[in-house]
């Protein structure tokens, strides 16, 4: 496990830096950020992605199912002298806004969809639609399942946390490798859950089409923007030819 997964303040700052440097510029074509802009992040964790939006004066709200992450988000925002509303709740159980003013201009769903159980993904996306303003947009980001660390094995410990593609091994062999590397039963359970909930580029495109979303922009990354914080290497978009190869592109899209 990388130190950044243990030091949550460092993790918060890294997410904020990536959002500030890349995500806000990426979204700039589609939304103008003002003090009236309402931003919701589903699965906000410590709130790092939301910090740059708060710094711009936006009204930010984060929802996460993990109480400790919500407490950390509140603490870190206070330390940064920024305002934010953070709610501990399962998003699928969150009550729909009753008025247009309560809805959101921008909804962030970053590194979340691959954790949603397959049977709940459709309901999850449909529920999100109730939170949009009439001209609202969503920003989705996720690692393609077959990419070198698409199984999130980096959050484990020992040699297995550094081995690419091991999540594609047969399940029994993968579990043995995690266990012999020192992973706890709960961590193995978490990684097995991600294995079940996996997300591919094609699966996502089909799912959002079925529930009536319009994709206004899609970018596949060979080296995704957050790798600059994680590994100090510059982002690189996927080459057009390789990005256009269905299924195979999941193996080299991060």
Feature map (PLM): residue ranges:
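Activation segment
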Residues: 95-96, 116-117, 149
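Alpha-helical structural context
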Residues: 29-30, 131, 211
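Surface-exposed loop/turn positions
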Residues: 37, 135-136
């Amino acid at each position: 496990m990388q130190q950044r997964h243990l030091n949550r303040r460092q993790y918060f700052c890294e997410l904020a830096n990536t959002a500030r440097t890349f995500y806000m510029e990426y979204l700039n074509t589609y939304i103008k950020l003002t003090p009236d802009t309402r931003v919701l992040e589903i699965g906000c964790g410590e709130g790092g992605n939301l910090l740059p939006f708060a710094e711009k004066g936006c009204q930010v709200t984060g929802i996460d199912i993990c109480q400790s992450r919500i407490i950390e988000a509140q603490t870190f925002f206070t330390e940064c002298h920024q305002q934010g509303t953070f709610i501990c709740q399962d998003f699928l159980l969150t009550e729909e806004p009753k008025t247009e003013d309560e809805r959101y201009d921008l909804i962030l769903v970053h590194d979340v969809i691959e954790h949603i159980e397959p049977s709940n993904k459709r309901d999850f996306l449909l529920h999100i639609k109730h939170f949009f303003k009439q001209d609202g947009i969503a920003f989705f980001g996720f690692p393609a399942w077959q990419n070198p660390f698409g199984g999130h094995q980096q959050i484990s410990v020992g040699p297995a946390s550094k081995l690419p593609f091991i999540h594609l091994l047969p399940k029994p062999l993968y579990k043995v490798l995690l266990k012999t590397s020192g992973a706890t039963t709960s961590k193995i359970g978490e990684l097995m859950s991600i294995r079940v909930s996996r997300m591919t580029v094609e699966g996502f495109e089909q799912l959002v089409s079925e529930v009536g979303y319009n994709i206004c922009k899609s970018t596949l990354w060979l080296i995704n923007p957050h790798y600059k914080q994680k590994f100090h290497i510059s982002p690189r978009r996927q080459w057009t030819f390789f990005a256009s190869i269905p299924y195979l592109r999941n193996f080299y899209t991060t």
